[in-house]
Amino acid sequence: MNPVVKVDNLSVFYEQHQAIKNIRFQAGPGQMIGILGPNGAGKSTLMKAILGLERYTGTVKVLDKHVRHVRKQIAYVPQRNAIDWDFPVLVEDVVMMGRFAHIPWFKRAGKNDKRLVEESLKKVGMEEYRSRQIGELSGGQQQRVFIARALAQESELFFLDEPFVGIDVTSESIILSLLQELRDRGKTIFVVHHDLSKVEKYFDQVLMLNKELIAYGPVADVYTPEMVAKTYQGNLATFSKKDEVMVVNV
């Protein structure tokens, strides 16, 4: 089975320091992959580099092409703190942004675009908020709207940067269920994640990062106390796996 994402010797430099170094991995279809690591490990940088939003050295192939040629096939949900929630835009217009790549220049959204927007809003339980300003919503509701935008895009790959941070339990459950459904349909999903207590529940594969690639593979093989300790290097209070709890340099 051909990889949908192939990264080889990827490095990113910021002025006088190296953010990530010599990252190599491949990801196939139908996987939900958690990107784990301490603050400053380069998780968001790695995601942005794959998406072509950061300059890098090395090679990145998405669907066997450079990312610039497959942007329609990629949906990206950035961190909430990277979004201007005060910008005056309606919920339905935010979701319609997911259709922009499919709408020809100087053309209006068609019936199919509007149908997909409505269906996406219903999937996240936000159809009754379609005419509300995005800034009026709670954090969880805002995140659901951006997930709806990603759904409307009808992509093959989904990249989400800390989608579960600062949201309510209902929104978390809805988002997780939708992501798992997408995975089961053969989509590939990358998630920057920080809550180690839910890794086994959320992910099939984990990519453990601390400027360099520490480990990558199935959760059962890679998500171990040894790999967690090596990844977090004392920046973690507890590691939880099923009934096992390990204290790491408290």
Swiss-Prot record:
Main location: membrane
Keywords: ATP-binding, Cell membrane, Membrane, Nucleotide-binding, Transport
GO cellular component, one term: plasma membrane
Molecular functions per Gene Ontology: ATP binding; ATP hydrolysis activity
Membrane-spanning parts: none
Residues involved in ATP binding: G37, P38, N39, G40, A41, G42, K43, S44
The keyword DNA damage is assigned to this record: no
Membrane topology: Peripheral membrane protein
UniProt record similarity statement: Belongs to the ABC transporter superfamily.
UniProt name for this protein: Manganese transport system ATP-binding protein MntB
Originating species: Halalkalibacterium halodurans (strain ATCC BAA-125 / DSM 18197 / FERM 7344 / JCM 9153 / C-125) (Bacillus halodurans)
